[in-house]
Amino acid sequence: MMKNQLAGLMKQAQAMQDNMKKMQEQLALIEVEGQSGAGLVKIVMSCKNDVKRVSIDPSLLADDKDMLEDLVAAAFNDAVRKAEATSQEKMAGATAGMPMPPGFKMPF
């Protein structure tokens, strides 16, 4: 009986690994947009944290350099948070049915 349970668990783990690989490939195609300054600075990145585009409203280019740098950093951080949330949500389906320890966080 124990041998069958182990075989089932191994099969489940292999399926989860396959699902996670497919999901990671899909995450590279999903884009999220981070914003700051009420949309004056926007950063588009993939859920694999590859920055695709940076948009800065022309009105900010004549302004304070420090403020612009802060807005870019804030937009980047917003995009990273959105990418992480999307990744966690999508990967939750890949691990469905597998017993995971409480608070376990996947490395992606």
Curated annotation (Swiss-Prot):
Alphabetic keyword roster: Cytoplasm, DNA-binding
Domain of life: Bacteria
Listed InterPro entries: YbaB-like_sf, YbaB/EbfC
Keyword DNA-binding attached: yes
Keyword set includes Cytoplasm: yes
Coiled coil: none
GO molecular function: DNA binding
Region (Disordered): 86-108
GO CC annotation terms, alphabetical: bacterial nucleoid; cytosol
Biased composition (Pro residues): 99-108
Complex formation: Homodimer.
UniProt cross-references to PANTHER family, sorted A to Z: NUCLEOID-ASSOCIATED PROTEIN YBAB
Primary role: Binds to DNA and alters its conformation. May be involved in regulation of gene expression, nucleoid organization and DNA protection.
Family: Belongs to the YbaB/EbfC family.
Name assigned to this protein: Nucleoid-associated protein HEAR1046
The organism of origin for this protein: Herminiimonas arsenicoxydans
